[in-house]
Amino acid sequence: MENGDEHFRLGLKLARKGLWKEAVAAYKESLNLNPDNAQTYLNLGFVYYELGYDREAQEAFEKASKLQARPCTR
């Protein structure tokens, strides 16, 4: 599985099942392959929040916000 989107979808499935730590691993792998995906950082923040990792959640939310604020260019 070398596609960031596949890892993202796996993270979604794991989070829906409450498998938080496994979801973190999937989202982190997704970010390794696609580091500018704001939605992945947002989801990772929610998972960290569920785990009680407040500092990590805040960092993920801030990263998502910064990425989302980038202007679209082509």
Say what each PLM segment does.
Residues 4-5, 38-39, 71-72:
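Helix-start (N-cap) detector for alpha-helical repeat units in TPR-like alpha-solenoids
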